[in-house]
Regions:
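Bacterial N-terminal signal peptides that target proteins for export
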Residues: 1-9
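Bacterial N-terminal signal peptides
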Residues: 8-18
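Sec/Tat signal peptide C-region and signal peptidase I cleavage site
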Residues: 19-23
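Carbohydrate-active catalytic/glycan-binding domains of CAZyme proteins
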Residues: 24-549
Length: 549
């Protein structure tokens, strides 16, 4: 299927090219650059690919095939636009073609924390229409959106009255069934005791029909108190219904398990050699570990081969990682009628053989390995990779004359609205990120610069602010909502280039004017920007931010 690719955010997105503050002192950003390098060393041959296939904050991948084309959707939580959609010909080279949630009217994230809102989407295709079924946590619950073109536009949500999270659609002939994580039929025996349920979905009427059936209680073996069975998917092969799901929680005990049945509604028997994917049994002190692997989706190629997309993380030490959960790809082997993504005790490889598919081309925006890019803000609006936090009620930016101009938003941490912040994912632990800014604050508290944000309570601000009547170039760390001034100097006049150099758990901050570059702070501990320290499920975004009167 041929599709049209969106060239940027819609006019409504984050205010788009609509009206924002027209004051002459509005912060203006004229350039944004990113240069990232992997911490692991890996040589990629001509018939090989590199993991992860999507670097940085791209969790909970769901993949489907339509003809010779593959489509992928991922979680985005309270970031907006959300639910990024990618396409590929070879499962290796991916190009973003849109965001399924790209209009303020689709979902309202007001009042939500960064790691709330849209969790674990599932994408499928039937009778000329693409379907995404998803959960909006702290919103209205589970919903379906549809599109004839996966690049969009996607419909407004159709809300579905069932509880739980992580729904996916299984299609059998002209019937559809939704399988998801819910509370067990019995009172929970322990924390993390969940169940997998199935119910028919009338896709023509957009409603649930019939009775719900519990397929899995607790996990593979209830006597061992398995936790957080979730992210279920069903597919059929050789007369069996296979149910795969994540088990163990999203941290280092994460895994993927599989069960099968001759009947759709069970009973399901677990694979004797579960899990079919995990890294929890490996030496935690190994070099360049990949951990927390799970939440897989299996897909069959047009050649009959099987592959799995799944999430995992690359910590820089222990369980510390700032860049979020990433998307990996591995072949699936079949043994005695059971799928295996990775044998027990094996480490996820950074390099693997390419699928037997027509050669794909790298997309215009790199997603894997070492890469960089520059945004000169020379279009009519921002590229679709930019995201804000929560759904904007009013415009917070415009793009004009080669500048990104930020308007008025709420302060970071104020959940009642969207801040004037647009960011890109930090996709490498070793990265250099720069922007050039012009801003003269008028009142105490006014500020503009670069923000590295893991959550509403854990972020760094590096830029120009006004304090006690003086314009200062300052670096602030906000950890669990508490601000700490790290360094400050009188702000230079005129344009200033702000540069963040990330090196694992450390960051260096420099600024440059026509008089050259100077360092403001070195060896700044950045572990508070990790998921372990901040909590939640997202990765760090870095980009321009402003708050001013």
């Amino acid at each position: 299927m041929r599709i049209a690719m969106k060239i940027g955010l819609s006019a409504l997105l984050l205010g788009g090219i609509g009206s924002v503050a027209s004051a002459s002192d509005a912060p203006r950003f004229s350039r944004f650059s990113y240069d990232g390098h992997t911490q692991e060393q890996a040589k990629v041959g001509p018939n090989q690919y590199r993991n992860p296939i999507l670097s940085g904050y791209y969790p909970d991948p769901s993949v489907t095939r339509v003809g010779d084309d593959y489509y992928l959707v991922l979680s985005s939580f309270a970031h907006f636009p959300g639910l990024p959609i990618f396409t590929s010909k070879d499962l290796v080279n991916w190009t973003q073609i849109g965001n399924a949630i790209d209009r303020p009217g689709q979902l309202d994230f007001t009042g939500m924390k960064t790691s709330q809102a849209v969790f674990a989407p599932d994408i499928s295709y039937h009778d000329g229409t693409f379907y995404i079924v998803n959960t909006c946590v702290e919103c209205k619950g589970n919903f379906v959106i549809t599109a004839r073109n996966p690049a969009g536009p996607w419909s407004d949500p159709i809300w579905l009255p069932f509880e739980g999270i992580d729904p996916s659609i299984f299609w059998e002939g002209d019937k559809a069934y939704i399988v998801n994580n819910r509370a067990p039929a019995e009172p929970p025996r322990y924390d993390g005791h969940r169940a997998i349920w199935i119910q028919e979905y009338d896709w023509r009427a957009g409603k649930m029909v019939g009775e719900s059936t519990q397929l899995i209680n607790g996990g593979v073996d209830l006597s061992k108190k398995p936790v957080w069975i979730e992210g279920p998917h069903i597919f059929r092969k050789d007369g069996y219904y296979y149910l795969t799901a994540a088990e163990g929680g999203t941290s280092v005990n994460h895994s993927q398990v599989v069960l099968r049945s001759k009947q759709l509604r069970g009973p399901y028997q677990p694979f004797a050699d579960n899990p079919i994917l995990t890294q929890r049994d490996l030496n935690p002190g190994r070099r360049d570990p990949v951990t927390s692997a799970g939440h897989a989706t299996l897909v069959q190629t047009q050649n009959g081969d099987w592959y799995a997309t799944f999430l995992a993380v690359r910590p820089y030490e222990g369980d510390y990682y700032n860049i979020g959960r990433e998307t990996f790809l591995l072949p699936v082997t079949w043994k005695d009628g059971w799928p295996i993504i990775l044998p027990k005790g094996k480490a996820i490889p950074f390099v693997a053989s390419k699928p037997r598919l027509p050669a794909g081309r790298p997309g215009p925006v790199p997603t894997s390995g070492d890469f960089g890019y520059i945004d000169e803000f020379d279009g009519r609006t921002l590229a679709m990779q930019w995201m804000g936090v929560r759904t904007p009620r009013a415009p917070v930016y415009r793009v004009e004359g080669g500048d990104l101009v930020l308007g008025h938003g709420t302060p970071i941490g104020d959940l009642t609205g969207a801040p004037a912040f647009v960011g890109r994912r930090q996709q490498h632990h070793n990265a250099t990120i720069s922007t050039t800014m012009r801003f003269a604050p008028d009142a105490d508290g006014d500020r503009a610069g670069l923000v590295a944000m893991q959550s509403d309570r854990n972020y760094l601000f590096f830029g120009v602010s006004r304090t006690a009547g003086k314009s200062m170039l300052s670096l602030y760390a906000t950890d669990q909502g508490k601000d700490r001034l790290i360094a400050s100097v009188p702000a230079p006049t005129g344009p200033v280039t702000l540069t963040i150099r990330a090196m694992g758990d450390r960051m260096t901050f420099a600024y440059a004017t026509t008089n050259g570059e100077r360092t403001l702070a070195t060896d700044v501990d950045a572990r508070f920007l990790s998921t372990k320290a901040a909590g939640g499920f997202v990765g760090t975004l870095v980009g321009p931010y402003a708050w001013y009167r």
